[in-house]
C-alpha cells in the first residue's frame, strides 16, 4: 500500500527497523552492563526461536518457567531446550495458577536433566521470579545476554487465583 502511494521501499524498510512489539524480544537493557531481553515465549517452539535469536558473542542466560493449568507436556521440552541452547538457566515460576509451583518447576527441570551433562547449561531454581531475574542479571558479565522468557508484556503473576502486579521489565 505504501509503495502504491509512492513511498520508496528503502524508507519502508527503515521504518520497520524501528517497530517494536512490547514483550517480544523487547530490549530492557537500559541501566544494565549486559543485554536483557524480555519475550513472551511460552511454548517449546517459541523458546527455541527466542533463545536462538538472543544468542550473541558472550554467554546466554535464560530465565524460564511454565504456566500452570496449561499443557503439562510442554514443560520438560521447554526445560531441555533452555538447557541445550543457553549457558545458564534459572527455572522459576510463571503464572502457576491453581497448580503447585514446585511441581511445575520440577517438570521443567526434568527436561533439563535429559540433556547430557557436557551439553547442559548450569541450572538454578527459585520460585521467586523477581529473585531469579535479579540473580540471572547479576551473574551475567558485559557481553552476555539475559533472556527472560514466558511473561513478555504481562503485568501480573497468577498464583492460586490471586493475581499480583508483576512485570518482567
PLM features: residue spans?
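ATP-dependent carboxylate-amine ligase
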Residues: 1-169
